[in-house]
């Protein structure tokens, strides 16, 4: 006679074991109709699963985040159902959920085309609209293997052979004649899976290993209702317009090429943005009392073994050899900063020491994961490490948090998600060390009034971390800033200071990055601003143009005045109509266009227009120089006339 406790604290008693759906039906027909699955004692379960003992239960509907994920997972099975009908010889591999959707890896003897995707999507919709029930059956390991052997599914058999214990009872989900294997849960009926869209096909190696066969990965998105799907597709269209790769090419910011995968060739205008970001961060380093250092980009393997990187991070490290010694190109800056700290005796009176570097790092990311500036192999971190005592942890982490919010606000980011990532399975240090480190970060977050989400097992191998994720104008999340507490690395590298009692102590090390990878941050703000960089960041801040040749000397005079004032300015003296010039520089997202005609020369002024088409009227040269200097100095986000 299980007693079921509901989220509001009310209880329901049943004479016999009861399914999640039956509990929902006992509450009301409306809830039963909306039920996708349940959360039994915090664990997600199918609607058909039986509850035989006293339990807490929360019904999952399409309004819940879990409900939407289940819909997406079931759409992956629906994709399998449809593609099997259209291509009976296809072999199904894996079909998990991802952000905003799902994918399925399939093995087919020919490449899928857009026409194929359209046909698969059409068949999926036809099947879903029959509103068939999804039937879950638990079977023995052998029965599951026999099922997939009969159906000619080698990848499902491999999953059983390599990933599932022989004593397990795998769940098979029956979609009419199609059968898939999954942990679940899944929707009880396909009426929940009417709103989806197949998006693209890409290559993917089986199990992510390039030694294995290349499969075809079909991507899709799925939502709870028609409106959500339409809104998402609109956001995708806007994201495509804002794609930093497209804008980067149009604005001549950078390029990448096959001979240097994951490495950036910065062009003049892109490098201008890069240097402006460095300059801005340097002003903040001075404000928050950091010293700036520079470490070598490569160090001996022996050092990386002492830090634990060689054992825990080797797959992502580039290595080289010289004179019978093995070196690693640094994937991060922290070991080098400890070496700088170790030069000379340090006292507790010297702490905290805040050490910052624009460190050039390299990580051997899989080629399939590389994506423009967002995922690269060579990048520059606005990295810092703070050496302090345990008593200083909370105040130093608080200072880091303030610096994070200070810097992000300059770029207009105010919606910031905070996450606390705890100890991973593969780590250094004992549990007592991790307890202290996790507790230290949690206390600092609480003291600063920040709500946060805990990410179990997502910390670095050497310490837990706070992550700051930015929400952009398209409601996408970008993880940028991190604050990590490290009790292990300084001790491994023999860092110490003389304490107040004259004894030797190991300092605590706080790892801190705000922009994260500068390359990636440029990609993020390129998309956030759609290439319309605020004046202080714009590679060219103003263009001065003539109407006829007779104004050429005056244009040069205005250009020189702006350039002498530190404004990034160009002159355009081409023999083209002024409207043509304005359009061209508007497409280049230049903030201000200064037009010089005979009237402007006579008045000693310039006529000013913005890239958004606003006519600001006329200004004397000195007036406009002063206005622009002040705007750049303030690092404002808006142009004149946009206030």
From Swiss-Prot:
Listed under GO cellular component are: cytosol
Give the start-end ranges of region Catalytic: 243-534
Name the enzyme's class. ligase
Q: Which GO terms describe its biological process?
A: threonyl-tRNA aminoacylation
Q: Name one GO molecular function term.
A: metal ion binding
Q: What does this protein do?
A: Catalyzes the attachment of threonine to tRNA(Thr) in a two-step reaction: L-threonine is first activated by ATP to form Thr-AMP and then transferred to the acceptor end of tRNA(Thr). Also edits incorrectly charged L-seryl-tRNA(Thr).
Q: Which family does it belong to?
A: Belongs to the class-II aminoacyl-tRNA synthetase family.
Q: What is the protein named?
A: Threonine--tRNA ligase
| Name of the encoding gene | thrS
């Amino acid at each position: 006679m299980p007693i079921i406790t509901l989220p509001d604290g009310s209880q329901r008693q049943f004479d016999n074991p009861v399914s999640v759906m039956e509990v929902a039906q006992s509450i009301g027909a409306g809830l039963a109709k909306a039920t996708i699955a349940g959360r039994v004692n915090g664990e997600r379960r199918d609607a058909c699963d039986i509850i035989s003992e006293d339990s807490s239960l929360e019904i999952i509907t399409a309004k819940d985040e879990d409900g939407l994920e289940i819909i997406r997972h079931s759409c992956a099975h629906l994709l399998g159902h449809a593609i099997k009908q259209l291509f009976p010889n296809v072999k199904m591999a894996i079909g998990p959920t991802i952000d905003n959707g799902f994918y399925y890896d399939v093995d087919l003897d020919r490449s899928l085309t857009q026409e194929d995707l359209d046909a698969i999507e059409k068949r999926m919709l036809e099947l879903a609209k029959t509103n068939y029930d999804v039937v879950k059956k638990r079977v023995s390991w052998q029965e599951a293997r026999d099922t997939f052997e009969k159906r000619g599914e080698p990848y499902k058999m491999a999953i059983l052979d390599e990933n599932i214990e022989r004593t397990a009872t795998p769940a098979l989900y029956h979609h009419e004649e199609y059968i898939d294997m999954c942990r679940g849960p899944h929707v009880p009926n396909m009426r929940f899976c009417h709103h989806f869209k197949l998006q693209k096909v890409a290559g993917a190696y089986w199990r992510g290993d390039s030694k294995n066969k290349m499969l075809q990965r079909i991507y899709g998105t799925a939502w709870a209702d028609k409106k959500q799907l339409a809104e998402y597709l609109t956001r995708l269209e806007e994201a495509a317009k804002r794609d930093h790769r497209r804008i980067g090419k149009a604005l001549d910011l950078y390029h990448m090429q096959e001979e240097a995968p994951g490495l950036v060739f910065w062009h003049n205008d892109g490098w201008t943005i890069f240097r402006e970001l460095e300059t801005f961060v340097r002003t903040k380093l001075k404000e928050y009392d950091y010293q700036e250092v520079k470490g070598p980009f490569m160090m001996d393997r022996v050092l990386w073994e002492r830090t634990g990187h060689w054992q825990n991070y080797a797959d992502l490290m580039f290595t080289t050899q010289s004179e019978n010694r093995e070196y690693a190109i640094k994937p991060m800056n922290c070991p080098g900063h400890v070496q700088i700290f170790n030069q000379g005796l340090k006292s507790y009176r010297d702490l905290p020491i805040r050490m910052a570097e624009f460190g050039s790092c390299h990580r051997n990311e899989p080629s399939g994961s590389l994506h423009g500036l967002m995922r690269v192999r060579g990048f520059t971190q606005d990295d810092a490490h703070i050496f302090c005592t345990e008593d200083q942890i909370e105040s130093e982490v608080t200072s880091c948090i303030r610096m994070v919010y200070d810097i992000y606000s300059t770029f207009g980011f105010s919606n910031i998600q905070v996450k606390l990532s705890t100890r991973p399975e593969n780590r250094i240090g004992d549990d007592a060390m991790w307890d202290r480190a996790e507790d230290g970060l949690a206390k600092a977050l609480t003291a600063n009034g920040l709500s946060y989400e805990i990410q179990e097992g997502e910390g670095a191998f050497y310490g837990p971390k706070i992550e700051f994720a930015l929400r952009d104008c398209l409601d996408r999340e970008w993880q940028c800033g991190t604050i990590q507490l490290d009790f292990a690395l300084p001790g491994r590298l023999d860092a110490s200071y003389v304490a107040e009692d004259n004894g030797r102590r190991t300092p605590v090390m706080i790892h801190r990055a705000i922009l994260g990878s500068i390359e990636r941050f440029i990609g993020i703000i390129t998309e956030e601003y759609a290439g319309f960089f605020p004046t202080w960041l714009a590679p060219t801040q103003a263009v001065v143009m003539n109407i006829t040749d007779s104004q050429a000397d005056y244009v040069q005079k205005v250009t020189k005045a702006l350039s002498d004032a530190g404004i990034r300015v160009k002159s355009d003296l081409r023999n083209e109509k002024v409207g043509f010039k304005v359009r061209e520089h508007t497409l280049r997202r230049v903030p201000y266009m200064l037009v010089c005609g005979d009237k402007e020369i006579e008045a000693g002024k310039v006529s000013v227009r913005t890239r958004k088409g606003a006519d600001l009227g006329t200004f004397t040269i000195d007036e406009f120089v002063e206005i622009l200097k002040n705007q750049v100095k303030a690092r404002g986000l808006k142009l004149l006339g946009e206030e």
